[in-house]
Each structure stands twice: as structure tokens, then as C-alpha cells.
């Protein structure tokens, strides 16, 4: 898949009204004959799959809720996050032709992980000028634990300019988006604008402030093409929560990766998710007492640490501004490249 630059004229209209019933319409997934077998998944060695710029291989057992989005023709085109047993959150621009997902895999090329067919999918209404998110409902529940969305006290205590996030995905590993590996990648990035209030030219005004945030790493470390829809995890004393969904590169990025990424804040779309799915999503439990002075204390050094209420549960969880916006969508090059 070629690098995708999307230029759109952004209207000043706001996002879909969550009180009016304007939630969009679910679309059925592809027909049954398009479903991949385990043997077909194991045969994906021809692909040019992908990873994060400046990252490292995810260890087995970490970030099992990170999903590779599979399309017709055995193609992986985006990344996502399992937020309920049968619900994956990803980018709105990743919704065309979804076949299913692979979760609980750190190397898609070896056929490992759990393949689950999609039942239906939906993009946020007018995602290109509001929230660039989409949902995939699965045919059956995943066996790995879903990730809780950062909300309420977790955001109050840990989401600020300078906070550290973990970015995980199946995107390119070089700034030009030409080199790929089979292994799931992760890295650490710094939040530079936690509510998209200081970089107005990079953010979509209709959902700012509070609908998006910006993060970047040192020495060009960043998400890249193929990480679209993937998770940004906020690491806290209370566990690791998904706080963002990869949308696009900043204006400084041009056609390269490494200058920062704009994320949709996951908490901003919780009402939409709950209305469409009928679920009451899990919420973090707020601890007593003030937050740590530096936002973190005594976190495990191991990547992908996942603790809820102080209990390590890794054993059951393998874990645009106004006018014309040159929005660099971080689409993942495919298992097989589309003609």
C-alpha cells in the first residue's frame, strides 16, 4: 500500500451530536467465503508487515489486546485495541473492507495469535472532520482480556504535558515508511499537548480542546504508516490504560514519520461506543489520596505491565485544523500490497 496523504477541506461543523441519535450505521463484515483459515494465517510470510520507528520487539505476553486489522486478500492494514471481549477500537479511516482481527500475537508472520472474524464495523460519523475512530464488532469474544479506557481520575492524575505513553503497533520502522518487520513493536513517547490546545494548526478545531492529543519521541522515535488506529497506553500506578488512538502525523511530519503524531483521546468517544454497542465499558477505579508527585511511582520496569487494583493480571492478559489539512494517515502496508 502506498503512503496515503489525505487532503480535505474541514468544515467548522462539530462532530456527531451524541444526544440526537446521530451515531452512524453498522456495516456487515465481509461474506463468509472471505474468512481466513489458520493455515492461511500461517502462510502470511509473503507479506511486508510492519512496526514503530525507533521501537523494539514486544515481549511474548505483553500487549495482547493490541489487534492487527485484517482485510480482504489476507491484508493487514491498521492496528487496533480490544476494549471489550468482542469490540475493537481503531481509526475511522481503517474501516473499509475489514475482514477480522488477530490478537494475542507478537509475530503475525509466524501464524501465532488468535484470529477472530469481524461481524460488523462502523466509522465515527464524518470522522475526517471530527473523531477519527471506528469500531469493529467480532463474531466471537477474544480469549485475551480487553483493555480499559483511561477516564476520570486516571486522566486527572496522569494525563498531562510531559506524561509518558507506550505506543504499540504494526507500522513501518523507518521514517520513510519503507522498512517492515513481522514483529509487533512498541516504544515510549512523551505527550506534548495533552488536550490539543496549544498546537491549533495540527488539531481539528471541532473537537478541540479535549478530543485529541499530540505525542512524540526523542531522536525521531514515533508511530508510522501502519500504526493507524493503534493504541497509546497511559502507564500508571493503577495499571496501563488505553488513552489514545493513532490518527495522523503532525504538519511537521510531511511525508515522513518522526515529527509527532496526533491521537484521538479514547475517553472522548466513550459515549459513542457505549451507545452503539450497548455496553457499559469498564472504568478505572479511583484510588484514595493524592497522585504521586511525578505522576508515577514504583511501576514495573517490564513493558506491558498490566495491573488492576494492584493485582498483576498478565497471566490472563497477553497483552486537522481548519481549512485544508494535509492529514498524514498512518496506514499500515499490507500483507499483500493492493494493486
Regions found by a protein language model. Give the residues of each.
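Hydrophobic h-region of N-terminal signal peptides that target proteins for export
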Residues: 3-13, 331-335
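Protease-domain processing segments flanking chymotrypsin-fold serine proteases, especially trypsin-like
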Residues: 10-89, 98-105, 109-111, 122, ...
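C-terminal subregion of chymotrypsin/trypsin-like serine protease catalytic domains
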Residues: 20, 77, 81-95, 99, ...
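Chymotrypsin/trypsin-fold serine protease catalytic domain
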Residues: 24, 29, 37, 111-121, ...
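Active-site-proximal beta-strand/loop segments in catalytic clefts of secreted hydrolases
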Residues: 69-72, 83-85, 91-94, 103-106, ...
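Short, solvent-exposed loop/turn segments that connect beta-strands within catalytic domains
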Residues: 74-75, 109-112, 176-178, 236-241
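Terminal processing/anchoring signals of secreted or surface-associated proteins
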Residues: 316-318
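A cross-kingdom C-terminal cell-surface attachment/processing module
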Residues: 321-338
Amino acid at each position: 500500500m502506498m503512503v496515503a496523504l489525505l487532503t480535505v477541506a474541514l468544515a467548522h461543523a462539530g462532530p456527531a451530536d451524541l444526544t440526537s441519535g446521530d451515531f452512524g450505521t453498522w456495516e456487515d463484515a465481509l461474506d463468509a467465503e472471505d474468512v481466513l483459515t489458520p493455515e492461511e494465517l500461517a502462510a502470511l510470510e509473503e507479506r511486508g508487515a510492519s512496526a514503530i520507528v525507533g521501537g523494539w520487539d514486544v515481549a511474548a505476553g505483553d500487549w495482547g489486546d493490541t489487534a492487527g486489522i485484517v482485510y480482504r486478500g489476507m491484508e493487514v492494514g491498521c492496528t487496533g485495541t480490544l476494549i471489550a471481549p468482542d469490540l475493537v477500537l481503531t481509526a475511522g479511516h481503517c474501516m473499509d473492507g475489514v475482514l477480522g482481527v488477530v490478537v494475542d500475537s507478537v509475530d503475525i508472520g509466524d501464524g501465532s495469535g488468535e484470529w477472530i472474524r469481524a461481524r460488523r464495523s462502523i466509522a465515527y460519523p464524518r470522522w475526517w472532520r471530527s473523531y477519527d475512530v471506528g469500531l469493529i464488532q467480532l463474531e466471537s469474544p477474544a480469549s485475551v482480556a480487553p483493555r480499559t479506557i483511561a477516564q476520570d481520575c486516571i486522566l486527572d492524575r496522569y494525563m498531562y504535558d510531559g506524561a509518558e505513553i507506550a505506543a504499540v503497533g504494526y507500522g513501518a520502522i523507518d521514517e520513510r515508511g519503507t522498512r517492515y518487520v513481522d514483529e509487533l513493536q512498541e516504544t515510549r513517547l512523551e505527550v506534548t499537548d495533552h488536550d490539543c490546545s496549544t498546537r491549533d494548526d495540527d488539531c481539528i478545531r471541532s473537537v478541540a480542546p479535549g478530543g485529541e492529543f499530540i505525542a512524540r519521541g526523542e531522536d525521531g522515535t514515533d508511530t508510522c504508516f501502519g500504526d493507524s488506529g493503534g493504541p497509546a497506553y497511559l502507564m500508571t500506578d493503577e495499571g496501563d490504560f488505553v488513552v489514545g488512538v493513532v490518527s495522523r502525523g503532525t504538519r511537521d511530519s510531511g511525508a515522513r514519520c518522526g515529527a509527532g503524531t496526533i491521537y484521538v483521546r479514547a475517553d472522548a468517544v466513550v459515549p459513542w461506543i457505549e451507545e452503539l454497542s450497548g455496553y457499559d465499558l469498564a472504568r478505572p477505579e479511583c484510588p484514595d489520596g493524592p497522585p504521586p508527585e511525578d505522576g508515577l511511582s514504583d511501576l514495573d520496569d517490564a513493558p506491558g505491565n498490566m495491573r488492576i487494583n494492584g493485582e498483576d493480571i498478565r497471566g490472563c492478559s497477553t497483552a486537522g485544523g481548519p481549512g485544508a489539512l494535509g492529514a498524514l494517515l498512518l496506514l499500515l502496508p499490507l500483507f499483500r500490497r493492493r494493486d
